């Protein structure tokens, strides 16, 4: 009977670890997918509109084509780069997780530190892009900055979608950091 009990314990201990391993892989796959989508959505974000410019009251308005592009604002460039870095890291860590399968604890420590770095990186990129996006949406009357989303609606909507998708990636990386901490806390 003693041998049967020890086998049951082994199975019970191994099952949560296997579930966590699958959860880890799925979160890494999710982080990879959504950061890739966010980077692609912002990289193709561009809109051209004819904007009437009034030079003088005595002249009719002059329609000038203006183009809104993601690379015209440094916050959007930073946002794209952070998502590209996080996407690349997610792909590499997913491959390492598949190859390693818990063999090297030193590697998992490094991955945990880099996961934490990705959380900070993505949230900072999301915050920067969201701040500029809100300025574009509402403007700032105190410094006489006009809103632009009423003119470049598609551009702003696509940027907002990219930020929302990237936030899902941020949360996936956050869960990759929190789940092992909770698991470690339960063991002690």
Curated annotation (Swiss-Prot):
Homodimer and heterodimers. GO terms for cellular component: plasma membrane. It is found in: Cell membrane. The keyword Coiled coil does not apply. Keywords: Cell membrane, Membrane, Transmembrane, Transmembrane helix. Its main location: membrane. PANTHER family: CASP-LIKE PROTEIN 1U1 (PTHR36488:SF8). Pfam families: CASP_dom. Belongs to the Casparian strip membrane proteins (CASP) family. Residues 1-23, 100-116, 183-188 are cytoplasmic. The chain crosses the membrane at residues 24-44, 79-99, 117-137, 162-182. This is CASP-like protein 1E1. It is a multi-pass membrane protein. The keyword Cytoplasm does not apply. Residues 45-78, 138-161 are extracellular.
């Amino acid at each position: 009977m003693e041998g049967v009990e020890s086998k049951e314990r082994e199975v019970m201990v191994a099952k949560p670890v296997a579930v966590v391993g699958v959860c880890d892989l799925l979160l890494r796959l999710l982080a990879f997918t959504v950061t890739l989508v966010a980077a692609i959505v912002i990289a193709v974000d561009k809109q051209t509109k004819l904007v009437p410019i009034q030079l003088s009251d005595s002249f009719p308005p002059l329609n000038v084509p203006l183009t809104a592009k993601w690379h015209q604002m440094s916050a959007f460039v930073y946002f794209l780069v952070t998502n590209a870095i996080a996407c690349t890291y997610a792909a590499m860590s997913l491959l390492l997780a598949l190859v390693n399968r818990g063999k090297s604890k030193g590697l998992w420590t490094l991955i945990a530190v880099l996961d934490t770095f990705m959380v900070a990186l993505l949230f900072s990129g999301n915050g920067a892009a969201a701040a500029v996006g809100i300025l574009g949406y509402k403007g700032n009357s105190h410094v006489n900055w006009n809103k632009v989303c009423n003119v470049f609606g598609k551009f702003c909507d696509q940027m907002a979608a990219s930020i929302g998708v990237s936030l899902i990636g941020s949360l996936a990386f956050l869960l990759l950091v929190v789940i092992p901490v909770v698991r470690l806390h339960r063991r002690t």
